[in-house]
Amino acid sequence: RVSVGFTNQEGILKNSDFKRVTAALNLNPSFFDDHLTMNLNAKGMYARSAYADGGAVGAAVKMDPTQDPYNFTSEYHKAQFGNALDQTLQNYGGFFQWSSAASLGDSTWPFIYNSTAECANPLAMLAFNTEVAHSRAFVGSADIDYKVHGLEDLRLHLSLGADVSKGRQAQNKSTASPSAMYYGSVGGESILKRNLSLNEYAQYYKDFNDNHHFDIMGGYEWQHFWKSTNSDYVGRYPMTNDDPTLAGTERPHTPYQYKTDSYLVSFFGRANYILMNRYYLTATVRDDGTSRFKDHWAWFPSVALAWKAKEENFLKDISWISDLKLRLGWGMTGQQAGEKINNYNWIPTYSV
């Protein structure tokens, strides 16, 4: 089975939208008279999101409705700018802004957006703030089950899984943007995640007669979680900097990069015995290992008894009881995930 999907959604604000393409493939082949069965799945996704500056909504409420958003038409502004009107309008990217005299030390920027007015031009906010995110994801799995020829009570099972995703977000504020006027800003970040898993086990079923059932299972599980984060945002020196040779150049900045991974490995076993389809005995044991703790390995046993009372003769004919089963169990559990548990807490750190 194959499926493909496409979404194209226009945003509420200008220059915002969402596009997504998805594809999925599912195969269920079987071989050797259904002794070997497979379930293969693959899903892929690509999405592009363009974000608009949400502050434009509030700015639109505050904006003077009589003011031309693309020009300075009042006598007040003509007198304020004088001969610098055309240059200021060009600096603002052709948009009106409430302004004040600049102290940038740059003769080509005599005026700058007056942030104390708290009334930026909403159209300029939407035009000069660009933020786009790209997301890619792939999820794949393969389940393979084999019923051994000549020993059909024995099954071998293998599961493989992969979950890979990558997100990249870029932001660019023009020098004409009221939130980064004159200086502008540019930057972005990307995150790559990769989770891999393997699960394999053997399971043996045996019905000795109508009253006795026994099954046992043993297996191995492996998981790897990996994540890489990169980000970099660039600022610039102002024209008023003490060293004029630095004016307009990038400030020193160190790109942020962080990688982390962890492993989870398990050996497990389980045995079930059922007597007369009424009395159940279950025992399990796991030997789990995680890279998140200094003591990597721990045992987790459990045992349970159950009585399916509905199968007893004195309850079978009571119609208002559809099922009744009593269970008593004991076990130990562990936790290697949590808000205060990260991959490297147990490793000492040193500062030089």
Go through the PLM ranges and name each one.
Residues 1-24, 32-36, 136-138:
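Outer-membrane beta-barrel translocator/receptor signature
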